[in-house]
Curated annotation (Swiss-Prot):
HAMAP family per UniProt: Glycogen_synth
E.C. number(s) listed in UniProt: 2.4.1.21
Protein name in the entry: Glycogen synthase
Pfam assignment, any one: Glyco_transf_5
CDD domains with a match to the protein in the record: GT5_Glycogen_synthase_DULL1-like (cd03791)
Upper classification of the organism: Bacteria, Pseudomonadati, Pseudomonadota, Gammaproteobacteria, Enterobacterales
Gene (name only): glgA
Purpose of the protein: Synthesizes alpha-1,4-glucan chains using ADP-glucose.
Family affiliation: Belongs to the glycosyltransferase 1 family. Bacterial/plant glycogen synthase subfamily.
Disulfide bonds: none
Length: 477
C-alpha cells in the first residue's frame, strides 16, 4: 500500500499549528506499520533547507508556472517538494505576509499543491505512484477534485483538522486552476458563490476523516459546520465520514526521555516531577511552594480556545490558593488582560507572551493541571501531552477533548478511568466548578497520585492511529 500525504507543513521543519505535528509523526508510524507513506509539501524556505538530500524527479510547466519536483528524506520519511521559488520562496508565514495579509496568489500556490498531488497518481514520479492520496485541510483540498477530473487514478482521503479554515477564493479563479467549470457547482466546490478548497476536499474525496470521533459527529451539526452540514450529514449517512484520533509523538513528548525538563520522571517516579514544578515557579516569578496547585495554559489566546473564560474565572482560582502559569499569544485584549493579572497578583500569576516550543515542555513537566477550556477543539494535542506528563487536563467536553479525558467523578474514580476534569457549558461558572473539583482532589494527595498514574498509562501513540488509517485505506481499495 503506497500513500501520499499532501499538506502544507511538517514538524519540525515548519509549524504554524497542530497539522504540522500530525504530519511530523503519522507517516513514520505508518511506515512502521507496513505502509509505504510519503509526504508532498511546498518547498517553503524552512522545509527546503531541512530536506538536505533532495534530488530532481521531474520538471513541469503548469498553470502556476514552471515547477521542479524534488525527492529527499527527513527522519526516515520520503519527502516530495514542489520547488517553485516564485510561489513559495518567501520569508515568514507560508500563508500571509508580514502585515498578516493573505498572499494574493494563494489560490495558485495551493491549487498547485493539490494538482501535483493528483499528478503523482498519474505518474509524475515514474518510479512511485500512490494507491491513496491523503490530503490535509483546505491547503490540499483540491487534490481530490483534480483526481476526480482525471477519472480517479487513486483513491482519496481528506482529513479535516479544523473546519473553520475554508480556503475561499473568487469564482473567476476557475479560469486559472485547470479544473472544469462544471465543478463550480453546489454539487462540487462552489460555496456561497465562491470556490471553497475545503468543500472541494469534502465533496470529491472517497472518504473524509476528522481528527477525533466526537469532532466527526459535531461537524454534522449546524453550530460546528459553518454551513456545510448538509454535505457532511450526507457523507455520514453514506458511511464516508469517520473520526481517527490524533496521537502523541513519544520521541518528542515523553517525561521519561525529555531533555528539556529539569528532572525526568515516569509514572513510577512521580516524586521527581516536583523539581520541574520548582524550576517553573522560579522561571515564571511565582512563589515557590509545592503545596499549592499550579494551573497552566499553553495556547493561542483566542475565544475559540476559551481563554476569556480563564480570565473571568481567574480570581476564583487564585482565591482558593492556586497559581497560574501562561504561555501564549493571540488576541491583544486577552494578552493585556493576562498581563494585567500578572501585575495585580505577583507571585500567583506568571505570564509569558509568545510561543517557545522548549518552554512548553517545561510547563507541561512542571504544572499540576493544564487548562484546555476550548469552545470547540477538533482533536487537541495539549491535553494529550498533559496526560502523558501526569499534568491533569481540565477541559470542556467537546471534540477530541471529550474523547480523551474522563472526569474525576466518583464513578470514574471507582472504575479506575478518571484522568482529569471535564466541564460542559462554555461559561466561567462551569469552568470554576471544574477548578473546584481539582482543588478537592488536590487535597487528597494519594488520590491525585492515583489519577496521575491512570492518565500516564493511557495509550495515545501514533501506532493506534496508523492502524486505523491502514484499515481505512484497505476498505477503499
Amino acid at each position: 500500500m503506497q500513500v501520499l500525504h499532501v499538506c502544507s507543513e511538517m514538524f519540525p521543519l515548519l509549524k504554524t499549528g497542530g497539522l504540522a505535528d500530525v504530519i511530523g509523526a503519522l507517516p513514520a508510524a505508518q511506515i512502521a506499520d507496513g505502509v509505504d507513506a510519503r509526504v508532498l509539501l511546498p518547498a517553503f524556505p524552512d522545509i527546503r533547507r531541512g530536506v538536505t538530500d533532495a534530488q530532481v524527479v521531474s520538471r513541469r510547466d503548469t498553470f502556476a508556472g514552471h515547477i521542479t519536483l524534488l525527492f529527499g528524506h527527513y527522519n526516515g520519511v520520503g519527502i516530495y517538494l514542489i520547488d517553485a521559488p516564485h510561489l513559495y520562496d518567501r520569508p515568514g508565514s507560508p500563508y500571509h505576509d508580514t502585515n498578516l495579509f493573505a498572499y494574493t496568489d494563494n489560490v495558485l500556490r495551493f491549487a498547485l499543491l493539490g494538482w501535483v498531488g493528483a499528478e503523482m497518481a498519474s505518474g509524475l514520479d515514474p518510479f512511485w505512484r500512490p494507491d491513496v492520496v491523503h490530503a490535509h485541510d483546505w491547503h490540499a483540498g483540491l487534490a481530490p477534485a483534480y483526481l476526480a477530473a482525471r477519472g480517479r487514478p487513486a483513491k482519496s482521503v481528506f482529513t479535516v483538522h479544523n473546519l473553520a479554515y475554508q480556503g475561499m477564493f473568487y469564482a473567476h479563479h476557475m479560469n486559472d486552476i485547470q479544473l472544469p467549470w462544471s465543478f463550480f457547482n453546489i454539487h462540487g466546490l462552489e460555496f456561497n458563490g465562491q470556490i471553497s478548497f475545503l468543500k472541494a476536499g469534502l465533496y470529491y474525496a472517497d472518504h473524509i476523516t476528522a481528527v477525533s470521533p466526537t469532532y466527526a459527529r459535531e461537524i454534522t451539526e449546524p453550530q460546528f459546520a459553518y454551513g456545510i452540514e448538509g454535505l457532511l450529514q450526507q457523507r455520514h449517512r453514506e458511511g464516508r465520514l469517520s473520526g481517527v484520533l490524533n496521537g502523541v509523538d513519544e520521541k518528542i513528548w515523553s517525561p521519561e526521555t525529555d531533555l528539556l525538563l529539569a528532572s525526568r520522571y515516569t509514572r513510577d517516579t512521580l516524586e521527581d516531577k516536583a523539581e520541574n514544578k520548582r524550576q517553573l515557579q522560579i522561571a515564571m516569578g511565582l512563589k515557590v511552594d509545592d503545596k499549592v496547585p499550579l494551573f497552566a495554559v499553553v495556547s493561542r489566546l483566542t475565544s475559540q480556545k476559551g481563554l476569556d473564560l480563564v480570565l473571568e474565572a481567574l480570581p476564583g482560582l487564585l482565591e482558593q490558593g492556586g497559581q497560574l502559569a501562561l504561555l501564549g499569544a493571540g488576541d491583544p485584549v486577552l494578552q493585556e488582560g493576562f498581563l494585567a493579572a500578572a501585575a495585580e497578583y505577583p507571585g500567583q500569576v506568571g505570564v509569558q507572551i509568545g510561543y517557545h516550543e522548549a518552554f512548553s515542555h517545561r510547563i507541561m513537566g512542571g504544572a499540576d493541571v493544564i487548562l484546555v477550556p476550548s469552545r470547540f477543539e477538533p482533536c487537541g494535542l495539549t491535553q494529550l501531552y498533559g496526560l502523558k506528563y501526569g499534568t491533569l487536563p481540565l477541559v470542556r467536553r467537546t471534540g477530541g477533548l471529550a474523547d480523551t479525558v474522563s472526569d474525576c467523578s466518583l464513578e470514574n474514580l471507582a472504575d479506575g478511568v478518571a484522568s482529569g476534569f471535564v466541564f460542559e457549558d462554555s461559561n466561567a461558572w462551569s469552568l470554576l466548578r471544574a477548578i473546584r473539583r481539582a482543588f478537592v482532589l488536590w487535597s487528597r494527595p494519594s488520590l491525585w497520585r492515583f489519577v496521575q498514574r491512570q492518565a500516564m498509562a493511557m495509550d495515545f501513540s501514533w501506532q493506534v492511529a496508523a492502524k486505523s488509517y491502514r484499515e481505512l485505506y484497505y476498505r477503499l481499495k
